[in-house]
């Protein structure tokens, strides 16, 4: 299908896509474990797809804690190549839209390549739209994670961190943000302008490194965050950190950060990070609910809070240019 810049969105099939993955970086061999697609035509949901996928590798403990998807759940499920024909029925002839879609595309490009397919040819150079880019132009950088952006727009998110649920929430967020233009009558050219310009299925920079959104923003802005982390003692802890930069070490991504709990620089394995929340937002929630989060004082985390499990820790190594996602630690 060919796409025209003057076509209104109502005349373009839109495929809202979300992936859940074994870890934070496709460049380090992490794989898709769940794919969700919601296809809209004429502004209406016409088809949806959701499938657990056997990644043929271990799922990180942080991902299991965040998504609830375990190694046992994906063992014996279809592989990505098994499910690609079914997924293509919803992707073909559609613009591709996602929340921080660059992250999802980094995984999908490699999965397509494993199937001996070029994603650009397979998807006919589909237009790409990113609700994160639109939100940043509308609200500024920071605080644009899907589960925080949706309520800001009056949308109640469905189950978080599952592929189809997040794809549907992204669709409703996109629809709401397009209201400031002409809704579904917004032409493709104007939709591009809403996000600051066109995007493609390939990265603008071939050496682009992608990280989870919350970490990316924390590294860019040098702002403190509250991190939930699975530590070396197999406890789930919560602490305030100042992210500094990312290391590559023995095939893993490591976050270097100042830990307020230890008042020292520490390293955290990316695969053990469950989630990150901006410190200001966490403080506002605490003030509103009058409840403490994991023994934290208004200034800093005062002690660790045990919750659940994690694999063993790693030592530290060489610095790589700052990248953009969440990460992990050495306690």
Q: Where are the regions that the model predicts?
A:
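Conserved non-catalytic scaffold segment of RNase H-like nuclease domains
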Residues: 1-113, 117-123, 140-143, 149-161
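Short alpha-helix plus adjacent loop in nuclease-associated cores
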Residues: 126-142
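Residues immediately flanking
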Residues: 19, 99, 131, 243, ...
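Short, glycine/acidic-enriched loop or turn micro-motifs at the edges of active sites
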Residues: 21-23, 133, 169
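Acidic, divalent-metal-coordinating active-site segment for phosphoryl/phosphodiester hydrolysis
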Residues: 162-175
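Acidic two-metal-ion nuclease catalytic site recognized across multiple nuclease folds
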Residues: 1-6, 173-226
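Core beta-strand-centered patch of the WYL/Sm-like small regulatory domain
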Residues: 206-331
